[in-house]
């Protein structure tokens, strides 16, 4: 009977983690609170701290008015740059002028870093603003890592920076070695 109660208690404690909710330290001040973002109601938000406008969903996902549906597409770095260029220039692309914005691009690593919610991990992004941030490979990635691609190149053009949204850490990868997910940004109009 004690084993039964222990198992039930553990299930009750761990159940919130199974749904993909971020793990947050409630004693820390929020670094990316929802109030900082202006929701345009069209799948985009403007960060009032930086003036940057962001797509709420990663490429491959679709905004349905309240969340991101589908699975994000992972791109190799050059592909990520090319798809961003197509979105800007190809009027037949589904995301051309998405949310009324015409200059979508890959963010640099400093821009991505402004999105990190330092009080949380799994994900380290504000899930109210960027829903299903941990989506990938047909599931919510609870034990893996999710990386966002940046346009920042380092080490004599052989590596590019990425943001690990699982932890909020920044890292570098050899260009062309691994595909990453893409969240597009635009400058203040």
Predicted feature residues:
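Glycine-aromatic-enriched surface loops/turns that form tight recognition elements
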Residues: 3, 19-105, 109-189
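Bacterial N-terminal signal peptides that target proteins for export
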Residues: 1-7
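Extended rod-forming repeat segments used as scaffolds/tethers
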Residues: 9-11, 54
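Hydrophobic h-region of N-terminal signal peptides that target proteins for export
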Residues: 11-19
């Amino acid at each position: 009977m004690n084993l039964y109660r222990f198992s039930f208690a553990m299930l009750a404690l761990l159940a919130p983690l199974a749904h993909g909710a971020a793990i947050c330290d409630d004693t820390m001040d929020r670094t990316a609170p929802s109030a900082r973002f202006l929701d345009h109601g069209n799948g985009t938000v403007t960060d009032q701290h930086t003036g940057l406008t962001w797509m709420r969903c990663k490429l491959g996902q679709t905004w349905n008015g309240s969340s991101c549906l589908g699975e994000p597409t992972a791109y190799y770095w050059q592909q990520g740059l090319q798809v961003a260029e197509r979105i800007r220039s190809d009027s037949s692309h589904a995301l051309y002028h998405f949310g009324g914005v015409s200059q979508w691009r890959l963010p640099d690593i400093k821009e991505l870093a402004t999105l990190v919610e330092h009080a949380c991990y799994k994900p380290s992004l504000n899930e109210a603003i960027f829903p299903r941030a941990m989506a990938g490979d047909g599931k919510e990635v609870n034990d893996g890592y999710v990386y966002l691609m940046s346009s920042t190149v380092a080490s004599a053009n052989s590596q590019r920076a990425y943001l690990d949204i699982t932890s909020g850490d920044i890292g570098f990868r050899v260009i062309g070695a691994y595909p990453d997910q893409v969240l597009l940004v635009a400058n203040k109009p």
